[in-house]
Amino acid sequence: MENQKNFLTTAPYKGTRDFYPEDMRLRNWMFSVMRETVLSFGYEEYDGPILESFDLYKAKSGEEIVERQLYDFIDKGERRVAIRPEMTPTLARMVAGNLRNLPKPVRWFSIPNLWRYEQPGKGRLREHWQLNVDLFGVDSHRAELEILLIADSILKKFGAPIGSYQIKVSHRKLLDSFLKNSLKLNGDQVHGVSKLLDKKSKISSEAFETEMKPFLNNFKEQFSLIETYLNSNLETVSKIPGIDTNSVSFIQNLFQELGELGIDKQLLFDPSIIRGFDYYTGCIFEVFDTNPENRRSLYGGGRYDNLIGLFSKEQLSGIGFGLGDVTLKNFLEGHNLIPNLSREKTIFLPIMDESLFVDTFKLSKELRENEILTETMLDSAKIGKQIQIAEKKGYRYVLFLGESEIRTETVQIKDLISGEQKSLPRKGLSDTLKKDFQL
């Protein structure tokens, strides 16, 4: 019996993706739109290591991440390290390490890849890329105003129409006052109820009620108050006994100024917004997709006033958000916002004859020097086969340079979509291609 070789699988690791060229075109386009938007607000790009000390995440990340989602191991130097599940702890370490040299306010952003060990599903993978936007050194609500403007501007830059998304806003001090003052819960109860509120949208109302019972002393009265809180608006929430009215006033003032800047239609006060990370201390928000087939949180963030406390005695207020590429892609697909990303703006240059190789490459060099993307064949296969390659790669325009074109100082250009072919003068060719063919 002939021995059979066991080949390795070609599938990527569970929860990760291969990015073929067409996938990279989409990813690069998404990243470029995000990058251009954030840069327009004066932010600077940074990056950090994919490996950090385990202790950094143990101290700064949420319980769920550290206990169940972290990829961690002991390195060859017997140090416990982890692959970054989020960027904020690295950001805090970097800012604290250079705090005195950084002009305030600090406006930074990054688009790192992040890892979490969790069950892959729609909008959720083990490896993803995430835009992180952070602003340090502004205590007033103007920091929230700018961050929310950026969060809104990104989707508008992608062409998202009004009504395709909502920005839901709340405040951690509002929640804390409700749990501690209104419900009169102790530390363990506060923790348990807070976690349940955070996952309320992911479980049934019956499960929510059942899981809430162990944390409440007077279930009927307290659960009724929880329902009142979750269904309240900015006017009614302030009437709940024990509520921090300063937080309500903060959101009201923020909404007023944002409305004057034209994003009031997207804004919604929603006290059910919790944000699972333990480091949020003030205003929190989430951006939701309104598509009936993808009603979920796209991204979110909030205020974290004590983030660098582990590294420095100095106080520095901060606010930021993270936007993942997986949920963004689902949003863009759901609202038909992804443009044609084919290679129509790249010239394909076949080799008409082996003797014309150098002449053809001189032409391609001329085009590239004039910022026209050009792919040149490297051998003189049958011209029909070369055209098939161009079609398969998604090219629209093919330039032909044969002996007759060299004699007459012209080129032939063919539109593979329409089938039209015509002669162009070699002189001023790059300008003609840019003007008449939008290349």
UniProtKB/Swiss-Prot annotation:
Reactions catalysed according to its record: tRNA(His) + L-histidine + ATP = L-histidyl-tRNA(His) + AMP + diphosphate + H(+)
A biological process term (GO) from this entry: histidyl-tRNA aminoacylation
EC category: ligase
Keyword vocabulary terms for this entry: Aminoacyl-tRNA synthetase, ATP-binding, Cytoplasm, Ligase, Nucleotide-binding, Protein biosynthesis
GO cellular component: a single term: cytoplasm
Keyword hit for Glycosyltransferase: no
Chief place of localization: cytoplasm
Keyword Lipid metabolism attached: no
Pfam families: HGTP_anticodon, tRNA-synt_His
Cleavable signal peptide: none
Family: Belongs to the class-II aminoacyl-tRNA synthetase family.
Subunit text: Homodimer.
Name recorded for this polypeptide: Histidine--tRNA ligase
Origin species: Leptospira interrogans serogroup Icterohaemorrhagiae serovar copenhageni (strain Fiocruz L1-130)
